[in-house]
Swiss-Prot record:
Residues 152-172 are annotated as: Disordered. It is found in: Cytoplasm. GO terms for biological process: protein folding; protein tetramerization; protein transport. The gene is secB. Homotetramer, a dimer of dimers. One homotetramer interacts with 1 SecA dimer. This is Protein-export protein SecB. One of the proteins required for the normal export of preproteins out of the cell cytoplasm. It is a molecular chaperone that binds to a subset of precursor proteins, maintaining them in a translocation-competent state. It also specifically binds to its receptor SecA. Its main location: cytoplasm.
Length: 172
């Protein structure tokens, strides 16, 4: 192979999953065993968050955090929090494409693992399985972008002027 072909291959965008792992998981059952005697249907609250950090040049860790809280009336039946992580090798990707890759593609890869781990620990704890629904990470990413833009615009407009000792603002 010629040097020119090697250079062209070295410049090609590269994406590889190095490792997928369960970074952390906790289960709390503060009202067991009495909660097992309750006959009322539980309410379920699910929260999902995504975070990413650069470990070294071209190597990123993405973490999808899922929290499931189930209550019967005002009593917590259980609370599960899991951090499903992955290490991704991402090189030669344009800067404007890196953030969507970390915020959409990587979480989409990790989420099925998170769902499985949460479902497993819930059933092993003695509760009925809760199957987390699919998530559109692109829509979630776009919502976060919109919220960040609105917050930035609000900060620009709301912080102009001088803040007086009584908390009011003097505009100039």
């Amino acid at each position: 192979m010629s040097d020119q072909q090697n250079t062209q291959q070295d410049d090609q965008p590269f994406f590889n999953i190095q490792r997928v792992y369960l970074k952390d998981m906790s289960l709390e059952q503060p009202n067991s065993p009495a909660i097992f005697l309750e006959s009322e249907a539980p309410s379920v609250e699910v929260q999902v968050n995504v975070g990413a950090s650069q470990l070294q040049e071209g190597i990123f860790e993405v973490v999808v955090t899922g929290t499931v809280t189930t209550k019967v009336q005002d009593k917590v039946a259980f609370l599960v929090e899991a951090h499903q992580a992955g290490i991704f090798d991402i090189r030669n990707v344009p800067v404007e494409q890196l953030d969507p890759l970390l915020g959409i593609a990587c979480p989409t890869i990790l989420y099925p693992y998170l769902r499985g781990n949460i479902a497993d620990v819930i059933t092993r704890a003695g509760f009925q399985a809760i199957h987390l629904s699919e998530i559109n990470f692109q829509a979630l990413y776009e919502q976060r972008l919109q919220a960040a833009m609105e917050e930035a615009q609000g900060a620009e407009g709301g912080n102009s002027g001088i803040v007086m000792p009584d908390g009011s603002q003097a505009r100039h």
